[in-house]
Amino acid sequence: MSGLRALLGLGLLVAGSRLSRVRVQAGSCRAGATWWVPQRLISGGRGDSEVMASSAVKYLSQEEAQAVDQELFNEYQFSVDQLMELAGLSCATAIAKAYPPTSLSRSPPTVLVICGPGNNGGDGLVCARHLKLFGYQPTIYYPKRPNKPLFTALVTQCQKMDIPFLGEMPPEPMLIDELYELVVDAIFGFSFTGEVREPFRSILSVLNGLTVPIASIDIPSGWDVEKGSSGGIQPDLLISLTAPKKSATQFTGRYHYLGGRFVPPALEKKYQLNLPPYPDTECVYRLQ
């Protein structure tokens, strides 16, 4: 194991149990208005619960999420990199609200960002860059890099900000628990279908054994977009982008934020998204 540490250039391990970190983090996030009420928690009675259910933000199917994305690109002429920048900033902001640097035991707090090969991975790269600006020390693991100018540019931006990239994934959950205070899951998004293949199958297996919190971007990797978890990772923070997906009703973590404040009002009305009122200039809204 000492050879692996030397290879990764990660330095000495910091002692301390995960339990103490959880106690520090509990209640550290500013309390916000709660907009989201999972349908599975609503009783059959009438009254306030029914009003909250009728006013709740809409949960999108995979087909609906793809349709909204296509309209943003085609009808409204947003570019991929434009939405990726806004989404990644939202993710970093939600993380900073849920886990402020002062609530964590290290200075700067160490964060491992694991990026997949698609747009979700691009969101993770942008998120890592903003986390560095917010006072965290991110490290990126990006095993499958698409040969496209957009992603090459995002990698360069992170490198220019002295954000390290790992050559290999730490193989044991305990090692990640000792080296990092948070893991960002930016592996798969809502467009993913089919079986999880290597190296991501092994990565998810390691993540399943972590005790440090996981923050998932849009969809917890390994989850069905509509049905939710089938024994996959259980994030502590979920950042839904544009609008929550149906799988979010199965989320049981402590923090659920909505990010991506870029939906035109006409598009929101067309799909009846019923998005919550973002306060002032905030780019995220706490749903749970």
From Swiss-Prot:
Disulfide-bond pairs as recorded: none
Domain YjeF N-terminal: 65-275
Posttranslational modification: Undergoes physiological phosphorylation during sperm capacitation, downstream to PKA activation.
First-listed, main subcellular location of the protein, grouped into a coarse class: mitochondrion
Assembly behavior: Homodimer. Interacts with APOA1 and APOA2.
Family: Belongs to the NnrE/AIBP family.
Official protein name in the record: NAD(P)H-hydrate epimerase
This protein's encoding gene: NAXE
